[in-house]
Amino acid sequence: MTVSAAQSTALNWVETARSGLSQDCARIFEYAEPAWREYKSAAWYVERLRAEGFDVEEGSGGMPTAFCAQWSNGDGPTVGMYAEYDAVPSNCQAAVPYAAPRVGLSALAAGHTDPHSALGISGLGGLLATKAAMETHGIKGGLRFTGEPAEKVRGSKPIHAAKGYYDGLAGMLSFHPFYMLPMCNTVRWETHCGAAYSMIYRFICDEPHLFGATDGAPIPQSHSDIRAPGANDALVMMYAQARMLRDTMLPHSGGWSISEAIISTGQATADNLPAGLAELQYMIRVPTVEMAQSVSARLDALADTVAAQTGCRVERHWVCKSRPGLANHAMADLVWEQIQQVGAPVWNDEAKYLMRKVQVNCGMSPNDDPVLPACKTLIAPQDAEAILRESLPPNQRNSTSDDYTDMTCHAPTARFYMARPALKGGPYPAWAMNALGGMPQTIDPMVQAASKVLALSALRLLEDKDARFAAQVEFERRKDDQDIPPLCDYPAPIQFNWPEYSETARGHDWHIPTSDAS
C-alpha cells in the first residue's frame, strides 16, 4: 500500500506533535463539561484554531458552544472533520488508576466516558496534520472543522445539518473511540446508526387557584384545603405511566430503546404549595423515523392526559430529531486502507502497568497483558458487518444510536472506530474505563492512531479525484433511494436546566454541591 509524500508528511506531523496532543487531550478531559454547557472546551478550540490560521464562526447554528472553522489552500475539494467535547454527569473521575473524582468535586460531577476529550483532540490532530501536508506539498482545497456540543443528547449535528454546515463537502470523516464489539479498529460498512427523537415535556402549574376552588377565598387557608396536585405530580405520573406502557409503543424487534431524565422539579422545600414547574426529557432511539414518530405521538397523548389530571398545562420542546445514517462503501474502503496502513494502537509497558493497577483496584487479578485482544487487532468492515447483522432482522437498515448520521445525509461519510484502552476480564465499574480514557499513557496511543487515520484519509480524498468521484456517485445513489430532508425545525434547547458547574461564594462546584458524604 503506497503512501504519498503528503501522507508521509502528515504522519511525521502527528508523531512530532505527540506531546502537544497529549497535553491538549488532558486539558479537555479535565474541563469535563456536560451537554450544552461546554464553555471552556469550545473557547479553547476556537482560540487554538484561530491561532492555526482558521476562520472560525463561534456559536454556529445558534448554539453558544458550537463552532465552524474553515481554512483554504486555494480552489479545490473541501474535506470535513469535527470535534465533540461534552462529558457525562455522575462520571467524574481523575486521571489516576483508582476510583477518585477530580480535585474539588464529587463523583456526581461530569466526566468523560467514551471519551469525547480524546475524540475531539484526535480530530484536531488529523486536521492540523492534513493542513501541514497541504501547505508543504501545495495541495489545493479546503478543510472544514465543526465543534459539536451535546452529542450525548444527539444535539448539535441535526441543527448544523439543517443550517447547511455539511453541504458542499467532498467527504466527511467521522471518528469515534471504540465502545462496542465488533466495531473496533474498523469502519462501518452497511448498517449505520439509526434515528433518534428527544424532547422535554415541561409541566407548568401556573393557575393552581382554579383547581378545586369552592369557597371563594383568595388562597387556600389551611394545609387541608384542596390544592392543585402540581407539576411534580404530573412528572411522576408521566414517568411511571410511560414506563408501564413502554412495551406497547412499538413491536418487539429492531433493538429500540426509550430512556428518560428528570431535568427540573419544584423548588419548594417543605412547603405545601403545588410545584410550579417540572421537566422530563425522553430519548427515543430507533431504526426508523416512523418508529420515532409513533412513540412521540404516544408520549404526547400521555403528557396531555397527566397535565389535565394535575392542574397543569404542558409544553413539548424538541432536543433532537435525528435521521438514520446512509452507508458509503467507497468512503469505507478508502478509510479502511488507511487503518491498515496505520495499524491498531500500541500500548507500551508503562500503559500496561497502569492498566494492571486498574484491574487490582477493581478487585481483579491482573493480567500480564491486560489489553482486550480486540483492541490490538484489525477487523475488516465486511467481517464486522457480518457479526453485527447476526442479531438483526434482515430487513432492518439501521441500528444503535449516534448523531453523526445527519452528516451522512449531506456528504459522503465514513464512520470508523479505533480502539480505546479496554481491559480483559470484568465487568468493571464505570470509573475504570473513565480513568483509562484520561491517563495520557493509556489514551494517547488511540489519539495517535486516530489522528493518523484521519489525516491519511483526508489527503487521499484531496489527492485522488477518482476516489472523490466514486464516493459522490454512491452518495447520490443512496440519497435518491432514502432521501430524508433535515428534520430539525426547532432552536437549540439551551435554555433548560441542564446539569452544569456553578460559581458561588463557596467557589467552583457542580450544581449539586460537593460534600464529604457525596
What label would you give each PLM region?
Residues 45, 122-130, 235-238, 242, ...:
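Buried hydrophobic packing segments
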Residues 88, 103-108, 117, 133-259, ...:
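Histidine/acidic-residue-rich, glycine-tolerant segments that coordinate divalent metal ions
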Residues 3-112, 117, 121-141:
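Acidic/His- and Gly-rich active-site-bordering loop/insert found
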Residues 28, 49, 69, 81, ...:
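Divalent metal-coordination and catalytic microenvironments
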Residues 97-113, 215-220, 431-440:
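Glycine/charged-rich beta-loop-alpha catalytic/anionic-binding loops adjacent to active sites
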Residues 87, 207-209, 284-291, 322-323, ...:
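A generic structural motif
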Residues 322-518:
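An extended, acidic, His-containing surface patch that forms the Zn2+-binding/catalytic region
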Residues 214-215, 221-273, 288-317, 325-372:
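Acidic-enriched catalytic cores of C-N bond-cleaving enzymes acting on peptides and small amides
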